Amino acid sequence: MYEAARVTDPIDHTSALAGFLVGAVLGIALIAAVAFATFTCGFGVALLAGMMAGIGAQALLSIGESIGKMFSSQSGNIITGSPDVYVNSLSAAYATLSGVACSKHNPIPLVAQGSTNIFINGRPAARKDDKITCGATIGDGSHDTFFHGGTQTYLPVDDEVPPWLRTATDWAFTLAGLVGGLGGLLKASGGLSRAVLPCAAKFIGGYVLGEAFGRYVAGPAINKAIGGLFGNPIDVTTGRKILLAESETDYVIPSPLPVAIKRFYSSGIDYAGTLGRGWVLPWEIRLHARDGRLWYTDAQGRESGFPMLRAGQAAFSEADQRYLTRTPDGRYILHDLGERYYDFGQYDPESGRIAWVRRVEDQAGQWYQFERDSRGRVTEILTCGGLRAVLDYETVFGRLGTVTLVHEDERRLAVTYGYDENGQLASVTDANGAVVRQFAYTNGLMTSHMNALGFTSSYVWSKIEGEPRVVETHTSEGENWTFEYDVAGRQTRVRHADGRTAHWRFDAQSQIVEYTDLDGAFYRIKYDAVGMPVMLMLPGDRTVMFEYDDAGRIIAETDPLGRTTRTRYDGNSLRPVEVVGPDGGAWRVEYDQQGRVVSNQDSLGRENRYEYPKALTALPSAHFDALGGRKTLEWNSLGKLVGYTDCSGKTTRTSFDAFGRICSRENALGQRITYDVRPTGEPRRVTYPDGSSETFEYDAAGTLVRYIGLGGRVQELLRNARGQLIEAVDPAGRRVQYRYDVEGRLRELQQDHARYTFTYSAGGRLLTETRPDGILRRFEYGEAGELLGLDIVGAPDPHATGNRSVRTIRFERDRMGVLKVQRTPTEVTRYQHDKGDRLVKVERVPTPSGIALGIVPDAVEFEYDKGGRLVAEHGSNGSVIYTLDELDNVVSLGLPHDQTLQMLRYGSGHVHQIRFGDQVVADFERDDLHREVSRTQGRLTQRSGYDPLGRKVWQSAGIDPEMLGRGSGQLWRNYGYDGAGDLIETSDSLRGSTRFSYDPAGRLISRANPLDRKFEEFAWDAAGNLLDDAQRKSRGYVEGNRLLMWQDLRFEYDPFGNLATKRRGANQTQRFTYDGQDRLITVHTQDVRGVVETRFAYDPLGRRIAKTDTAFDLRGMKLRAETKRFVWEGLRLVQEVRETGVSSYVYSPDAPYSPVARADTVMAEALAATVIDSAKRAARIFHFHTDPVGAPQEVTDEAGEVAWAGQYAAWGKVEATNRGVTAARTDQPLRFAGQYADDSTGLHYNTFRFYDPDVGRFINQDPIGLNGGANVYHYAPNPVGWVDPWGLAGSYALGPYQISAPQLPAYNGQTVGTFYYVNDAGGLESKVFSSGGPTPYPNYANAGHVEGQSALFMRDNGISEGLVFHNNPEGTCGFCVNMTETLLPENAKMTVVPPEGAIPVKRGATGETKVFTGNSNSPKSPTKGGC
């Protein structure tokens, strides 16, 4: 403020006047709302409430004015100054005499303020921020000359808000209270008229009620049961054909406040807009006067009546949650609780004309406006981002023909509209030139619409009770429905040709009050006086209650268990300031005067803060996490994130073209990815820093049909008219085929000789699944659609004549559908949850059949802090205690036997040191992308190097860090990749060179190591079964994906697909026994030396907690017995306990299943039994040297000596140890990621299954079925690039650029998903989220599911695009469909891919790929971020 002012320096006028008007609008609305609510309570109460509101309104005036004063624009310059005193060669300015040229005022205003103790030519020196007599301020000054002293006003300064306006507005506040009360009186007699029909989209995602209902009701059921929409869709209450604008979006003009060009259609609209009769565009909302009222026509063509308003008055529609205000200068402004302001300009209701919307703004001042011709048609759309759209009209009917984006001299066609001979919209052509929609009409009524792929929905009309109504619909796929209307009885029935019937009842306002679904499920809805649902009675004896405030906002929501969540809001908005859950946990948020989040707190009091630039924007410039870490964000004029700097000062930059399409992304190392995109934004080619690229081809609907990956590998996808996948062809030409019924439900999936078939209930739920080996799975559901039973009918035995084996599993759930009891033939498992639905205890009790198998009772308990974070888990082998920092990072892990692991972190959680007790395990160094480049390993140091694609290309360990590099050091390993990104060669200091080759689909076909003189060859059948020879002779040894023969091995299976017998030549036989959940219980191994019986025990979550080996000689004499016990950290083995000692495992902080070290300690009992010196009492630490997928290759001790080294066969069997070094000095059972080798069985325990390294596949079927892939025994295409740590579904692990569609595990009701995003390295990185368990966002009600957590992760980390693969066979639930777009940052995009063959069965599940985009009304993240 002390910068010296000079001639030519700018003067600025603030937006105080504009801000004052916003404050006035808010204040009038506030008083009017209070008066509405209190008028009937008596004049005294109304007066008191009005006085209180007046206090608030006057405060709003001040807030509005201060909002405006935050922002300024240049309005002129200083034009006169000192004749002989210069600053930076410019005349110095001084008060009382220096004049300015102001564009807003005449004659020449003077500088009014100046320094109290520095004078120029006897006059006070002027500085930056000193006032001008017209109310402006000096906007800039010298960068190196400063005039200090206080500030004194020497001349009068005009107020930027005129006194007359202050007086008028004060009067308006008083009048607003009176008129508000009258409005409340008039409301009962029709003074304020509700729309004749309810909002057609009121209950879908993105709308408050849709979001609330989506927590309890499936998305399709919300539309049908509550919204009254059926089919594609039809409004069953009126028989009108509608098309929701949410599914008819043609283009979004990028801007800080984006402009969506989307169409709404209703056959009930007689008005012919610029697209023809029945169609409405967003800019066709309007006001007009009729019958003594002001009628507002919204974007669905619905009319709502407001009373006539005088200047300074406002009215509020509770049903539609909108305010209409007439400002003192005669302008009409409509605004909603979403804080969008619609300016209709100055309007005289007596004129008879229409007042069209002319400008739209949000609370932050971001805007777009419409320029119109003399006919009221929009000719241009201007945006605050600088892009404009030009609208051209065809000449025959004057309809809208094209919308073209314009930036300076560059033009881009966004959408083209075509018309039939009657001027009705007939086609929509997108920016790519593809015809994406076609329509046909008869007598002005829509009779069909077709998508880009030819899927057609057709309609038959009949006049009933004087109105045209749809009486029949059919599709090009053969689906057919008929509609029966009882207008007088207010009910409608819809029938299918097979006899299924749905039935609705509705009230006089066309609100659904009862609905019976196709499967008999019954719904009932009760409403309050303004049409807001207050009670929702659902199938399964479930009731949901809602309470509202006077603005129609949900303030209390009580679920079917009687648990209530309460919400408070900020002002007259939908912004929550406090959400208190049923468990008492509270989330709070604070906003600034523009409605932007400035801070939030969770139940633990952890605070996140946001900073914003001094500009009209809702986009934050900085985010401070709960530890004070600062991340900065830079945005371009279109609202695109162009710079993200983490709290370590590392920056990622993204560039966009003038039309908002991504061009490139550059990481902190300067590595750049470039994008060639289609006009609609999808990538055509992505080129990586090394010059390699991927290309994408799309059909007319914009869905991917051909993908050419790295190395030129081609995948092709064939789709039906619905866009559903009907054939997938991999790069090797193998095909997976899909067949659907007329309603789009998957009926058959075939991969070569392997075939799955499916049947469904009347309500569309999956009833049966038949697998390739003949196993039949039958599903049973409750009234609420929850799964209650599963019958598994074993595969038919061609040699047996009796009935097939049947296994029955039963589920008991509470009224929220949460699993409480699971009953299997061998055990009963009970689940306990707290009020936040967090799992607190799982208890197992064996049945008599289970006791016979040796299963014993067991329990696991969990503890959480006030923030809902998991802090402890207790099991039969001890407790694991988590100490978390403010960002939810584990900083200490307490283990049984008094052991502790500590992680020292920097930034938002990057680990730089790991300690075991007082001993340092490893110190880490990282590069600018936070990747590990160095770690200590006792006396050794290991360094790593990466290629431009982020893949590890070398690692080297040795005593002298300075001597480490590619091919040097004590232990070194180099990696080579082919053009497709597959690992083709490893060379290391112990094993020499090992080469790998692959088929075109990336499946391993050979492995060769000249040093070992071993060459392995493999082949694959079309169903993904690994065969043991390249000539495919063993093809006949696979039936129904069950492997029967492999070299000298022979396999037999039980009826449920579990390996029952394995024979190795004539000398070894193994027999396997399983429990009621197909978990391996015993292995009986007999060979020429005798018998080994191996028995396994599991906790109630299915984690192996004990293994006992008992050896017998050939006479049956017991030789020895050994038991090992296991402790788990979540789903990761953390401790192995033997009679004499404990081994604790430490994993990489960057690769969760790649071991870093093992700490071996002697048990206390052994210490007490023998004399051991103090040096041996400390842990003995061994260090792992792993390959890129985390498989241990060597183990060294603290002195740097090799204690173990393994020689692997292709599929993970260690055939020799310590080649080229001394004898092994320690056992090392870890193998591929998540695997533990059992010497007694030859199998690898793989968390939820056992893996057989002899044949490279699992011994039983995937617990998650098709979610893990079409072949339920399959491990991975190749074991050197893929991992499957849970034994459920493989995922690609070599580099950040290729991604698979891994399907992750569901257990105990959890949905697990992997979120992929572009990291600071410019590559794809992954993060696993799960529902039903610990989450990084435990205190945000909308982040319980994978999609919500991914969306918040995107927001908190400045990520503009992400991809989610999840395991839920029910697809994306209605809650996530409804909420994710609200959670996403503005303009961000997230694609959610369900498991293969996902089928909706409950809670809004949708088994299709969903694309979510963020909107500008979404609340800012209430959670932490990461660097």
Swiss-Prot record:
Single GO term (MF): toxin activity
Phenotype upon loss of function: A double dddA-dddI deletion has a 100-fold growth disadvantage compared to wild-type in competition experiments.
Entry's family note: Belongs to the RHS/WapA nuclease family.
Record-linked CDD domains: PAAR_RHS
Function recorded in the entry: Toxic component of a toxin-immunity protein module, which functions as a cellular contact-dependent growth inhibition (CDI) system. CDI modules allow bacteria to communicate with and inhibit the growth of closely related neighboring bacteria in a contact-dependent fashion. Bacteria that have this module inhibit or kill bacteria without it, giving them a growth advantage. Probably specifically inhibited by cognate immunity protein DddI. The C-terminal 163 residue fragment has double-stranded DNA cytidine deaminase activity; it does not deaminate ssDNA, ssRNA or dsRNA.
Comment, domains: The toxic domain is at the C-terminus (residues 1264-1427); expression of this domain in E.coli reduces viability nearly 1000-fold.
Top-level taxon of origin: Bacteria
E.C. numbers: 3.5.4.-
Record region (C-terminal effector domain, has cytidine deaminase activity): 1264-1427
Protein name (database record): Double-stranded DNA deaminase toxin A
Biotechnology: The deaminase domain can be used to edit DNA. Is particularly useful for editing organellar DNA, as unlike CRISPR, it does not require guide RNA. Splitting the domain yields 2 halves that are not active until reassembled on target DNA by programmable DNA-binding proteins. Can be split at residue 1333 or 1397; each of the halves is then fused to a mitochondrial target signal, a TALE array specific for the targeted DNA, the half DddA toxin domain and a single UGI protein (uracil glycolase inhibitor), leading to editing without significant generation of insertions or deletions.
Biased composition, class Polar residues, residue ranges: 1412-1421
Bilayer-spanning residue ranges: 16-36, 43-63
Keywords for this protein: Hydrolase, Membrane, Metal-binding, Repeat, Toxin, Transmembrane, Transmembrane helix, Zinc
YD repeat windows: 469-501, 548-584, 720-747, 977-1008
Binding-site residues for Zn(2+), renumbered to this chain: H1345, C1373, C1376
